[in-house]
Design a protein with these regions (language model features):
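DNA-contacting interfaces and partner/effector-binding or oligomerization modules
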Residues: 1-57
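Basic, amphipathic alpha-helical hairpins
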Residues: 51-85, 104, 108, 125-134, ...
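Short alpha-helical elements of helix-turn-helix
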Residues: 65-72, 115-122, 147
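Short coil turns linking two alpha-helices in DNA-binding domains
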Residues: 92, 96-98, 145-146
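DNA-binding alpha-helical recognition surfaces that contact promoter or target DNA
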Residues: 102-103, 114, 126, 149-153, ...
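Terminal helix-turn-helix DNA-binding modules in bacterial transcription factors
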Residues: 106-142, 168-180
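Sequence-specific DNA-binding recognition helix
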Residues: 132-168
Length: 180
């Protein structure tokens, strides 16, 4: 009897081997979340030394933090796009999410879902702290179709509401410090 292994079986087996190696061999990820994160802010506030007027100057953003097209495109979509879905990601990246998850694991030590969630949390924290965006707009910017998804994520991760998290993060002078 011949054993036939299809593409999906091969991918599943490969993913299992990679997961095992990543969890059990002292695997060191190539990139940290801080290295991958693309800030949503394009300008930084400063005060004119003569007039004291608040002005903005452009900030440089590394739009290709990994130099790997597939990962950089994912980061650009997740960090800089308005609302998107898993289908949008799959179509724009041209890869199945299971395959992409293994790719993420190799580069970051996190599978797609964990990486995506970590980026969403970081993005939401930045938007809540430095902008006066409505909560629903923050949620959309983080890839949720409505506020409830962001609320549930914050309740699960921080054990607090989005508004409570905003009050915890925000310091005097933060709003307007950066511009999208």
């Amino acid at each position: 009897m011949d054993i036939v292994v299809g593409k999906q079986d091969f991918l599943y087996l490969g993913a299992a081997i990679i997961r095992f190696m990543a969890m059990n061999t002292g695997f060191t990820p190539q990139f940290s979340l801080d290295e991958l994160y693309i800030s949503p802010f394009s300008a930084e506030r400063y005060f004119d030394s003569v007039t004291g007027q608040a002005l903005y100057r452009p900030v440089e953003r590394n739009m290709s933090p990994t130099g790997i097209h597939l990962m950089d495109r994912f980061l650009q979509i997740v960090c800089l796009s308005e609302h998107y879905t898993v289908n949008t990601l799959r179509n724009k990246l041209g890869v199945e999410m299971r395959e992409f998850s293994v790719f993420c694991l190799l580069l970051t030590g996190m599978e797609y879902e964990s990486l995506h969630e970590a980026i969403r949390l970081r993005l939401a924290d930045d938007l809540l702290r430095f902008t006066d965006m409505e909560m629903r707009d923050v949620a959309r910017r983080c890839g949720y179709s409505d506020y409830s998804g962001l609320f549930k994520l914050f309740e699960r991760k921080y054990k607090r509401s989005v508004g409570d998290r905003q009050r915890q993060l925000r310091k005097r002078g933060d709003v307007g410090r950066w511009r999208i």
